[in-house]
Design a protein with these regions (language model features):
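Extracytoplasmic electrostatic interaction patches
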Residues: 75-191
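Exposed boundary/loop context
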Residues: 12-14, 72, 157
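Surface-exposed polar/charged interaction patches
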Residues: 12, 47, 64-67, 162-169, ...
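N-terminal export/targeting and maturation segments
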Residues: 19-108
């Protein structure tokens, strides 16, 4: 009778240990991929005109390092709609021009536009999930801008000037490199 009870206790203990181990491993893998997604995305091939490092940064901003920089504010959407929203705002007050502040936003993805960048000249650019430009709007002229006329290299250089410090702060090699798993999860999205 006693040996039967010991066997049951041993089996239950082993099952609990295996369950806790599996949960820990799954948590570690997810947190590793989220926290180091900028590093991983810099080491994956991606389509032309895509800048996926900003997409990964904004998708996983809660897990990312948010360096304290003078006049830079990080703000998740708050209020009743913010509880269910995935919106996140990054303001760079250091590059204000004519009271226009550069803002990088992660939007809800209802219409395929996942990210928005407001420059300090009153222009708004929307990007898809791979961080390719989808549309542009000039708020001072109150008109759409043909994206074929946008110098995309200059635009991305400007975004890097305003928010590139976030990429640099989060481009760190992880202790356990899970690049193969990241590639398996995100390769199709960026190619």
């Amino acid at each position: 009778m006693l040996s039967r009870l010991i066997k049951r206790m041993l089996i239950i203990t082993c099952c609990l240990l295996v369950g806790v181990g599996v949960l820990f491993i799954r948590w570690y893998i997810k947190s590793n991929i989220d926290r180091h997604s900028v590093y991983y995305i810099m080491n994956i091939s991606h389509g032309r005109d895509a800048h996926p490092e900003f997409a990964m940064l904004l998708d996983n901003i809660d897990s990312m390092e948010q360096p304290e920089k003078k006049k830079v504010r990080y703000k998740p959407e708050s209020g009743a709609s913010g509880v269910f929203s995935d919106r996140f705002y990054i303001y760079n007050g250091a590059n204000v021009l004519n009271d226009e502040e550069p803002i990088l936003i992660k939007e809800d993805d209802f219409d395929g536009d996942a990210y928005v960048y407001y420059d300090n000249r009153g222009r708004m650019y929307t990007f898809d999930k791979t961080f390719k430009v989808r549309s542009a709007y000039d708020s001072k002229q109150h008109q759409d801008i043909d994206i074929k006329t946008v110098d995309q290299k200059a635009l991305y250089d400007e975004i890097y000037k305003d928010f590139g410090f976030l990429i640099k702060a989060n481009d760190k090699k992880p202790m356990i490199n899970l690049q193969w798993l990241f590639n398996k999860k995100y390769y199709k999205r960026f190619n």
